Regions:
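Terminal end segments
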Residues: 657-660, 664, 712, 716, ...
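Extended, noncatalytic alpha-helical scaffold/tether regions
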Residues: 81, 85-88, 92-412, 416-417, ...
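Acidic, polar low-complexity intrinsically disordered regions
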Residues: 54, 58-88
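Extended alpha-helical scaffolds
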Residues: 22, 29, 33-36, 61, ...
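N-terminal alpha-helical scaffolding segments that mark the starts
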Residues: 1-50, 57, 87-89, 100-101, ...
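Extended alpha-helical rod/solenoid/coiled-coil scaffold segments used as assembly/tethering elements
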Residues: 372, 408-710
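Extended intrinsically disordered, low-complexity coil regions enriched in Ser, Thr, Gly, Ala
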Residues: 133-136, 154, 387-389, 393, ...
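Eukaryote-biased recognition of C-terminal alpha-helical segments
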Residues: 399-424, 428, 432, 570, ...
Length: 779
């Protein structure tokens, strides 16, 4: 329709006869097409009607077949289904009857077994008094289900004229009677010390279902042995023995060893007769006795050693020497009196008498011994009580059982040992640092005169460094030997703080107030004694840093040469619980890092002061003397003989002057410190050489450039003699400057604009600098 409308519109819109004919032609074509399609549809209608008729016939035929099929199903298959249903029901009834028969037979057999056990128990407990057999019958009866034992059938069948009571009553009465009998016999054997009888009756308790009674009796038995031996060890000692340094440590060690021997020796027996994991109940009972006996030892140690009084004395100690040393008004003379001098002895006598360091050291040794033994004991019990298979695969380390973590002994270890040991160790170390500086002595007979021998052996440090680092090593070793994380977490940070604040602080104060190398007169050099003292203090820092690093690495116990990151640290043996070993390792590394940082900062400052006040003022005069009366613009043939004689005059002058300054310092400084100082000195020397070369602008000809290059090279060789070849790197600018001075014009033209290194020379001079250097040579 839309086409017709459009066509009519075209016709109506026609403006000429030709357009009308064209529109009519299109309409005729459309008419022919529509007529053809209609004829095709009319022709296909007959075939469609015929196919629909065939479908109606097929539908009627299928309806007939469906009726026949339903008739066959209801007539034939229903009989088969009914038969199958009857057979299935019969099979099910047969299976049920069979299972009932089996259940009945099983009950009959169990009742027969029950009757045999009841009669066996009654017979064995009679005249024969065969307790093992009676217990065996009770054990067999315990395997019979309770519903059978308590059932009416058993109550009807089992009783006899000799045993008229129901089986449950008979069994319970027999078990109770045997339990009382076994308990009496067990305790009697324990009192008599008859080990075989103790074992005999101990094995019978689980057979009669009295496991807890047996374990409790056994626990009391072994605890009596523990208590008896502990009292003997403690009370048999004479008063003089109790005053010995490690009496209490040895006593509690014997207690722990005895308990460990009992657990190790008796565990197989308990596990075999009572089942896996049952030894833990005996261990818990032993721990109660350990709380008592160990508590007595710790209480007596705390009282006899006057721990509370010692802690009071420690808290009241003023550390007068350290405090006064850091006061701003403190201006000690260069020769500080020794502590043994009459000038200082009177002021400290009362303090030294108030706290006996030897006694504190002894208490710390004994305390560390007890803590270490307790750690081994705790680890042993934790291993014994640990589950055979962890709940998950994540390794949380060893876990302390709850009965031990909440025990009175554990609480007393914390209050009577760990807290006092932490306080006394911190005091002991700080007082040792104070004492070391009170007794500090510099190395004897040091001199800057290279012709005189040194009166000491290197490294040249004061006595305080060796003294303090010896105490650091001792304190760290003793702290780790306790195997207590709480001791490490308190002591190691305290040691780190004292080292950083007071050990380094004392050296810093001496460097600033007593030994600062300041010239006496303007433009002069510092006094020799000040320079020597300053050098020694710088050595103190370097050697102390090396000591601390070695102490920590020794405790970590790892070999850095193997390159294996998964090497297990020995700290895992000392600290097996949780992640304590990782915590301890990180704490030690933090101490090492903190000390290295503080000592390194002060060391670098000291090297800078030494360079600025001692070495730097000498560099310019040394160079001036080396280049004195040397000309680099000689005429051809002028003074050739003289120049050949003085070919190395600059190098020899410099070597002489440089050696006068450097060699005395090198004799005293450690090699690491000397390398640090030399690096600063060479940087300054390189800068001075660059300025010296530039100062010859317009005063260097081609012959002079050759000699200047030789002289600069000679100075570099003399300055870096005996050091690493890499020290020459700071002179790259000077070397390249002399290289440019001696280039031919065409050679220089090739490298003048080189910025990419195509010339084969890694230039440190930029393009403009190269041009300015080239201009130094007279054209």
């Amino acid at each position: 329709m839309a086409v017709e409308i459009d066509d009519h519109q075209d016709i109506f819109a026609a403006a000429s006869v030709a357009q009308i004919h064209e529109a009519l032609g299109q309409l005729h074509e459309q008419e022919a097409s529509v007529t053809q399609r209609l004829n095709a549809l009319i022709a296909s209608q007959k075939d469609l009607s015929r196919e629909l008729g065939r479908l109606d016939l097929l539908r009627a035929h299928l309806g007939t077949q469906a009726v026949n099929t339903r008739a066959i199903s209801s007539g034939m298959l229903s009989d088969a289904a009914s038969t199958a249903n009857r057979i299935s029901s019969a099979v099910k009834r047969l299976d049920q009857e069979q299972s009932n028969v089996k259940a009945t037979l099983e009950v009959v057999e169990q009742v027969a077994e029950l009757k045999a056990c009841v009669l066996g128990v009654h017979g064995s407990m009679g005249a024969p008094q065969d307790w093992e057999t009676a217990a065996g019958y009770l054990s067999r009866a315990a395997k019979i289900p309770d519903d059978v034992v308590n059932g009416s059938f058993a109550e009807e069948i089992v009783p006899t004229a000799e045993v008229p009571d129901p089986p449950r009553v008979t069994l319970d009465a027999a078990a109770e009677s045997l339990c009382g009998l076994f308990l009496r016999e067990f305790e009697k054997a324990a009192q008599e010390g008859d080990g075989s009888k103790v074992t005999r009756f101990f094995k019978l308790f689980p057979l009669i279902g009295r496991t807890n009674v047996g374990l409790d009796a056994y626990g009391r038995y072994v605890c009596q042995g523990v208590a008896s031996r502990a009292r003997t060890n403690f009370n048999s000692a004479a008063p003089a023995q109790r005053n010995e340094g490690f009496f209490y440590g040895n006593t509690i060690t014997k207690l722990f060893e005895h308990i460990a021997q009992i657990v190790d020796g008796h565990e197989p027996l308990v596990e075999r007769h009572y089942g896996p994991g049952m030894m833990q109940k005996v261990i818990e009972r032993l721990q109660i006795e350990a709380d008592v006996q160990g508590g007595i030892v710790l209480d007596t140690w705390h009282e006899e050693r006057h721990i509370d009084r010692k802690l009071t004395d420690i808290k009241s100690y003023a550390f007068s020497f350290l405090v006064q040393s850091f006061l701003p008004s403190q201006k000690p003379a260069a020769g500080t009196p020794r502590s043994s001098s009459p000038a200082n002895g009177a002021g400290r006598a009362s303090e030294d008498e108030g706290v006996d360091m030897k006694e504190i050291d002894g208490l710390l040794g004994e305390g560390a011994l007890i803590l270490g033994r307790y750690a081994l004991y705790a680890r042993f019990l934790s291993d014994k009580c640990a589950p055979s298979e962890p709940e998950d695969r994540i390794d949380y380390g060893l876990v302390m059982p709850n009965f031990l973590a909440t025990s009175n002994l554990h609480k007393k270890v914390n209050s009577h040992l760990i807290e006092p040991v932490n306080a006394m160790t911190t005091f002991f170390f700080r007082r040792s640092v104070e004492k070391a500086f009170q007794l500090d002595e510099p190395p004897a007979d040091l001199t800057l005169n290279p012709t005189k021998p040194l009166g000491s052996n290197p490294p040249f440090i004061t006595s305080a460094v060796d003294d303090v680092m010896y105490i650091v090593n001792q304190v760290i070793q003793r702290t780790l030997a306790t195997s207590q994380r709480s001791v490490v977490s308190s002591v190691v940070p305290a040691v780190s703080h004292i080292l950083g604040a007071e050990f380094i602080g004392m050296i810093q104060r001496k460097m600033r107030d007593e030994s600062y190398p300041k010239p006496v007169i303007q433009g002069g050099l510092p006094p020799e004694d000040k320079v020597i003292a300053f050098l020694v203090l710088i050595n103190n820092l370097d050697i102390a840093n090396d000591y601390v690093k070695r102490i920590v690495q020794q405790q970590l116990g790892r070999q850095s040469q193997g390159g294996e990151d998964d090497v297990k640290s020995p700290l895992h043996d000392l600290f097996p619980f949780g992640h304590d070993a990782v915590f301890v390792e990180n704490t030690l590394k933090a101490m090492e890092k903190a000390f290295a940082s503080k000592s390194g900062d002060l060391l670098n400052d000291g090297i800078t002061v030494l360079f600025s006040n001692v070495l730097k003022p000498r560099i310019r005069p040394i160079l001036a003397e080396a280049f004195r009366d040397v000309k680099y613009d000689p005429e051809d043939g002028e003074n050739e003989d003289k120049e050949e004689e003085d070919v190395d005059v600059v190098k020899s002058r410099f070597d002489r002057g440089w050696g006068v300054v450097i060699r005395p310092i090198k004799r005293i400084l450690t090699s690491a410190n000397f390398d640090r100082l030399l690096a600063l000195g060479l940087n300054s020397l390189a800068s001075s050489l660059e300025k010296r070369i530039k100062s010859y602008y317009g005063r260097v000809n081609e012959l002079g450039a050759v000699r200047l290059e030789r002289d600069i090279s000679g100075i570099i060789t003399a300055a870096t003699s005996g050091g690493a070849y890499s020290l020459r790197d700071v002179f790259q600018k000077s070397t390249q400057m002399t290289l440019i001075l001696n280039m031919e014009d065409d050679e220089f033209a090739e490298v003048a604009e080189d910025t990419s290194g195509d010339s084969g020379i890694p230039w440190v001079l930029d393009v403009e600098e190269r041009k300015r250097v080239r201009a130094i040579v007279k054209g």
